[in-house]
Curated annotation (Swiss-Prot):
Miscellaneous note of the record: Present with 623 molecules/cell in log phase SD medium.
Organism of provenance: Saccharomyces cerevisiae (strain ATCC 204508 / S288c)
Compositionally skewed regions (Basic and acidic residues) per UniProt: 12-31, 72-88, 117-129, 587-596
Gene3D superfamilies in the cross-refs: 6.20.250.60, Immunoglobulins
Subunit structure: Component of the SNF1 kinase complex, a heterotrimeric complex composed of the catalytic alpha subunit SNF1, one of the three related beta subunits SIP1, SIP2 or GAL83, and the regulatory gamma subunit SNF4. The beta subunit serves as a bridge between the catalytic and the regulatory subunit. Interacts (via KIS domain) with SNF1. Interacts (via ASC domain) with SNF4.
PTM sites of type Phosphoserine: 33, 181, 198, 200, 206, 209, 220, 331, 494, 497, 643
UniProt family annotation: Belongs to the 5'-AMP-activated protein kinase beta subunit family.
Stretches the record annotates as Association with SNF1 kinase complex (ASC) domain: 724-804
Name recorded for this polypeptide: SNF1 protein kinase subunit beta-1
């Protein structure tokens, strides 16, 4: 078995065709392979096939030459057809007919009905034809060969079917008009299968090619190339305009869109108004689908827009003409294009004013009156923001189709809150427009009609000259007045960031009353803290309720109650004592006459809930955090406020009732009640106290004088006699213990010898015995009660002895 081929084609032995060095390298590489050793016949077949295809394939690599050597003129079984001739043009990679042929021999074909013989075996010796010619899988190592042919750009191919022409005509065509044989074979197979109603599976490709008419460009199959919608970003965040790349559409594509959109409900959006929005990508996809679904509506809307513009030009109305050119679909009241629920939700989320303008134009006159009325009632601080609202209303939206996606404008307060249901996002911004108040302030309204005139004065030092700078420093008051702008804040305070936290309000000097006051101070209901600044020194007033802040500084404070015209916080203890505590001979103070005025809109107030008419001068309770007294009869006012009686009645002070009877708790004796009111005849004579009777009532000097018998007995003997008759009860357990006695004795000895033993003084009483009342048993009608407390590291025990007539009372009861 040699490595040289057994047979060679003499016609190509002396001719060096183009690319011969590639074939020599390929054959040299194949000599050492296992396939060349097993199949000797394969060498001659490969050599003959390579020489045959070299005329047409030129420098095509050997592996492509093996695939291109199959001639499309053969049938499925590999034999030559009688109606066709060998075509010298480039061979196709796919067959013309993919149907199975019944004429194929079972022994000569595989399961896929493909034979192992080719067109080169025709006319060959019989023993060579019978032997199967296996195609080589290629060299064992990957090889890269140079080629001069350019690779086809698949993206530039026009996927249309063209006529079959000769090789010269096909080569003369441009590169992008030539097609791969695989695409042509597949398209041709589709045409053949569609031309016959029931194609026979055994029909050969030659029959199909003969029965089909000549293919023209009009009968070609065009593979439609879908033009995707491009996503153009707009000024909106998470919002895009989905428009087609081509601004003009053909009539066929428009008819197809109209036919497809008939079966789609325009109102059936992907997301309904009550669905939960998960993320922005879901909204974008839903909006894109709605844009495609409403293409028919947009086209009809554009036609209506053109008619509307022409009609406006004929009338000559310049204002309507400008509005219809920019916003013909949105400003019309009669024509309303159907809009899906998803589009409505996107408009509400991103501030589109199209739907709001539709509803507002229907009630334009009513809305305009409501706006003018509410604009006049707002404060000066919000007029600048409302000016931008007018410019926003004058600016009309521009609609290019049925759905308008405008750039996101900054949200402004919408006045007509009850006119449109789409003004919820704007009202959400109003709640955050007001500045944050202090935790001590309970400001619930900014309407000037509900504010109360507060008179604040500085009366502590009447010698303060008019040239002195006096200010009120209060964060709570400045926060309440920030929106109203009724008081002029200090310019220095507005420039200094630290002073903005404690803005200063200038006080005015009254030459008549010689006092400082704040003019025109209107505050809503709430609690306010303040301090006075005199020549830059912070202080507080003693004529106002005082409290302490978190840092321990003294501050003044007052409370504004709702429903009063004018209040003046004031505290004067002398005036309070003279007004609250009148004598019985003086007439009781009467409340001032009540004045009827419109009730307040506050429903949470105690007075408005009860429907009580409020006086012009309040009886408010300015007691402060320290529960200090008030100038306005606080006790009577609190009782009236807490009671359910008539609040119109006069205040009646409580009358004290005196008695001459001594309660039994304070009677000292055998329990008999002594009445002062009783006559002397009713009182029974009793034995005077002595050593043997009622010893507790005896005088100590008289008692011991009797015991000593005029000096016959000394004091110690008399004391021993007394203790023998009336023994003193024992001390408590923790005081009568041997341990404590031993410690006390040691301490006494150390003190006498002037030697302090600190370790010996350790008489610490257990904490469970502290602040507990300890008693002893009743002995000789005497009971002792003791209690130990701790004071600055020392223990103090107090023992109280009290008489107890338990036996005497028991004997009297038994008698």
């Amino acid at each position: 078995m040699g490595n040289s081929p057994s047979t060679q084609d003499p016609s190509h032995s002396t001719k060096k065709e183009h690319g011969h060095h590639f074939h020599d390298a390929f054959n040299k590489d194949r000599q050492g392979s296992i396939t060349s050793q097993l199949f000797n016949n394969r060498k001659s077949t490969h050599k003959r096939r390579a020489s045959h295809t070299s005329e047409h394939n030129g420098a095509i690599p050997p592996r492509m030459q093996l695939l291109a050597s199959h001639d499309p003129s053969t049938d499925c079984d590999g034999r030559m057809s009688s109606d066709t001739t060998i075509d010298k043009g480039p061979s196709h990679l796919f067959k013309k007919d993919y149907s199975l042929s019944s004429a194929a021999d079972v022994n000569d074909t595989t399961l896929a009905n493909l034979t192992l013989s080719d067109d080169h075996d025709v006319g060959a010796p019989e023993e060579q034809v019978k032997s199967p010619s296996f195609l080589s899988p290629g060299p064992s190592m990957a090889t890269v060969k140079r080629t001069k042919s350019d690779l086809d750009d698949l993206s530039t191919l026009n996927y249309t079917m063209v006529d079959e022409t000769t090789e010269n005509e096909r080569n003369d065509k441009p590169h992008h008009e030539r097609h791969r044989s695989s695409i042509i074979a597949l398209k041709k197979n589709l045409l053949e299968s569609s031309a016959t109603a029931s194609p026979s599976p055994t029909r050969s490709s030659s029959v199909h090619s003969a029965s089909l008419p000549a293919l023209t460009k009009t009968d070609s199959i065009d593979i439609p190339v879908r033009q995707p919608y491009s996503k153009k970003p707009s000024i909106h965040a998470y919002q895009y305009q989905y428009l087609n790349n081509d601004e003009t559409f053909s009539e066929n594509s428009q008819m197809d869109k109209e036919g497809n959109s008939d079966s789609v409900d325009a109102e059936a959006g992907v997301l309904q108004s009550e669905d939960m929005v998960l993320n922005q990508s879901l909204l974008q996809n839903a909006l894109k689908k709605d844009m495609q679904r409403l293409s028919r509506v947009n086209s009809s809307n554009s036609m209506y827009t053109a008619e509307r513009i022409s009609h406006a030009n004929n009338n000559g109305n310049i204002e309507n003409n400008t509005r219809n050119k920019g916003n013909a679909g949105g400003s019309n009241d009669d024509f309303t294009a159907p809009i899906s629920a998803t589009a409505k939700m996107m408009m509400k989320l991103y501030g589109d004013k199209t739907l709001m303008e539709r509803d507002l134009n229907k009630h334009h006159n009513k809305t305009k009156k409501a706006q003018n009325k509410k604009i006049r009632s707002v404060s000066n601080s919000r007029r600048s923001s409302f000016a931008s609202l007018h410019s926003l209303q004058s600016r009309k939206s521009i609609l290019t189709n049925g759905l308008n996606l405008q750039p996101l404008h900054p949200l402004h307060p919408i006045i007509n809150d009850n006119e449109s249901q789409y003004s919820a996002p704007q009202h959400r911004e109003i709640s955050h427009h007001s500045n944050s108040m202090s935790s001590m302030s309970s400001i619930s309204s900014t309407n000037s009609t509900e504010n109360t005139l507060v008179v604040l004065k500085w009366k502590d030092d009447g010698t303060v000259a008019a040239t002195t700078e006096v200010f009120i420093v209060s964060t709570d008051i400045a926060s309440a007045l920030k929106e109203q702008r009724e008081l002029t804040l200090d310019e220095n305070a507005s420039l200094d960031s630290e002073k903005q936290l404690n803005p200063r309000i200038r006080m005015v000097y009254d030459d008549v009353h010689k006092e400082w006051f704040v003019p025109d101070l209107f505050l809503p209901a709430g609690i306010y803290r303040l301090q006075f600044s005199i020549n830059g020194i912070l202080t507080h007033s003693n004529f106002l309720p005082t409290a302490t802040d978190s840092e321990g500084n003294f501050v003044n404070w007052f409370e504004v109650l709702p429903g009063y015209h004018t209040i003046e916080p004031f505290r004067n203890e002398a005036d309070i004592d003279s007004q609250v505590e009148p004598t019985l001979d003086e007439e009781l103070p009467k409340r001032p006459e009540l004045k009827r005025f419109p009730s307040s809109s506050r429903k949470s107030s105690y007075y408005s809930a009860k429907g009580v008419e409020r006086p012009s001068t309040p009886f408010s309770d300015y007691r402060g955090l320290s529960r200090s007294s008030s100038i306005n009869m606080r006790d009577s006012f609190v009782r009236l406020k807490a009671s359910s009686l008539d609040l119109m009645a006069e205040v009646k002070p409580e009358r004290l009732v005196y008695s001459n009877e001594i309660p039994n708790l304070f009677n000292i004796g055998d329990g008999s009640t002594i009445s002062v009111k009783g006559d002397s005849d009713d009182v029974h004579p009793q034995e005077p106290p002595s050593f043997t009777h009622r010893v507790v009532d005896c005088n100590q000097d008289d008692l011991f004088a009797t015991l000593q018998q005029g000096g016959n007995i000394d004091a110690e003997t008399a004391e021993a006699v007394f203790l023998s008759r009336y023994p003193v009860p024992d001390l408590p357990i923790y005081l009568n213990s041997s341990y404590l006695n031993r410690i006390l004795n040691q301490s006494n000895q150390n003190s006498e010898s002037h030697e302090r033993d600190e370790g010996a003084i350790n008489h610490i009483i257990p904490h469970v015995n502290l602040n507990h009342l300890l008693t002893s048993s009743i002995r000789d009608e005497i009971i002792s009660v003791a209690c130990t407390t701790r004071y600055e590291g020392k223990f103090i025990t107090q023992v109280v002895y009290a008489p107890c007539y338990y036996k005497t009372q028991k004997s009297q009861i038994s008698n």
